[in-house]
Amino acid sequence: MDIIGGQHLRQMWDDLADVYGHKTALICESSGGVVNRYSYLELNQEINRTANLFYTLGIRKGDKVALHLDNCPEFIFCWFGLAKIGAIMVPINARLLREESAWILQNSQACLLVTSAQFYPMYQQIQQEDATQLRHICLTDVALPADDGVSSFTQLKNQQPATLCYAPPLSTDDTAEILFTSGTTSRPKGVVITHYNLRFAGYYSAWQCALRDDDVYLTVMPAFHIDCQCTAAMAAFSAGATFVLVEKYSARAFWGQAQKYRATITECIPMMIRTLMVQPPSANDRQHRLREVMFYLNLSEQEKDAFCERFGVRLLTSYGMTETIVGIIGDRPGDKRRWPSIGRAGFCYEAEIRDDHNRPLPAGEIGEICIKGVPGKTIFKEYFLNPKATAKVLEADGWLHTGDTGYCDEEGFFYFVDRRCNMIKRGGENVSCVELENIIATHPKIQDIVVVGIKDSIRDEAIKAFVVLNEGETLSEEEFFRFCEQNMAKFKVPSYLEIRKDLPRNCSGKIIRKNLK
């Protein structure tokens, strides 16, 4: 079923400007409280100016341009400005350091970079020490270093006309973006995303939360992440709604921002929910207009109930990954919700559970969650320049192996168990990290938790727990292990405990387990 009909991203923005004109499209709030607003007409003009800027710098269809930016209007300008001229955006996680950023530059073949003064010293070093194809850098800040090959993004953009100067033929099959995965267990892979992928994501995600043009979708998720782009931004723009992009998440500021912008939809990850719950209760906790909170794994039922009760919201569960573009399994608008189910397969998708021999399993049996879509349309096209990795996860007929374990019930509701790589093998038993983390998270002194497997010469793997305590709390090993023994089977009780100030996370809030031993 083709729901796009040849409408690439350039056509989308021209149509949105015509239809919605002076209606507010984008609101950006910086960490310093500076707010920028753009109507659909104004935003399309800024996108055109940015496209013209890239053209004057020699960027043509098929060229790759890297963005290393925090949430800001310039990210949106660049994203769609590049798409309008058929160039390809390569967003870089703003938390990455020199080695990882250089690796993405090298492996994406990016020839131009847009970044800020905050990250510029790192890229100076990369240009001096690493072999990349980078030939120019645009800085979004006003003050510029006196270096060759560096220019002001804002000054160049403001010199451009508001109408597009270069409009090569485009197809919805053209690549719009190469988004490198977070790489929590290995080197990141470049997920190739087409114009069709992004257009479909907008319509699908708008359907998922029943988005209307009078909605306000607020997100604090990073713009370089698939959730912000495909679940939030593309959904809001496709519906003609208002998209609010906050530069940085703050638990203290979040509800005030939701109230100020009269947000009706937002998205949360477990880290956000836990930090919001430790804020002092306020009479304003329920003074908001949120209709849905899009939610991504993983949370205990006790935590979910406490959050919904305190803030008067309901969670709309959505399950997906960079390769699926959107939440391909999730709660449906107007449908029943069955916690802790992650929902049912969305329209245009099939889902099933398979065993280790790639055979479908009946309801109730645990296996790998597999998704069927159309590569380059409803799921990613391929891994950039990595056919071996593509073939490992994507079958020729469109079945995608997620690497996650789960099961489904007789009514087609799916249940997430864990990432396959997060299953601990202990003395012949398979132990789910997520299961243990959900149990341990109910301890009143614990704010954050992750468990990992470490080598054990006798039992294959031992279990180690890393915990972050609530402010002012202390926790003895005796108290911790006694709690575990009272709440889980003996073979699941961790052997080791380490108390830390924080846990290493990537841009989407996922624990970087490879950094924990």
UniProtKB/Swiss-Prot annotation:
- State the UniProt keywords alphabetically: Ligase
What is one GO biological process annotated to this record? carnitine metabolic process
Query: Which pathway or pathways does this protein act in?
Result: Amine and polyamine metabolism; carnitine metabolism
Would you indicate the residue range of the signal peptide? none
SUPFAM superfamilies noted in UniProt = Acetyl-CoA synthetase-like
Q: For this protein, what is any one GO molecular function term?
A: crotonobetaine-CoA ligase activity
Entries under CDD domains matching the protein: FACL_DitJ_like
The yes or no answer to whether the keyword Ligase is present is yes
What is this enzyme's catalytic activity, as reactions? 4-(trimethylamino)butanoate + ATP + CoA = 4-(trimethylamino)butanoyl-CoA + AMP + diphosphate; crotonobetaine + ATP + CoA = crotonobetainyl-CoA + AMP + diphosphate; (R)-carnitine + ATP + CoA = (R)-carnitinyl-CoA + AMP + diphosphate
Return the EC number.
6.2.1.48
Q: Give the protein's biological function.
A: Catalyzes the transfer of CoA to carnitine, generating the initial carnitinyl-CoA needed for the CaiB reaction cycle. Also has activity toward crotonobetaine and gamma-butyrobetaine.
Kindly give the NCBIfam families that the UniProt entry links to this protein.
Answer: PRK08008.1
The record's comment on protein family reads: Belongs to the ATP-dependent AMP-binding enzyme family.
Stated name of the protein: Crotonobetaine/carnitine--CoA ligase
Taxonomy-wise, where does this protein's organism fall, top ranks first? Answer: Bacteria, Pseudomonadati, Pseudomonadota, Gammaproteobacteria, Enterobacterales
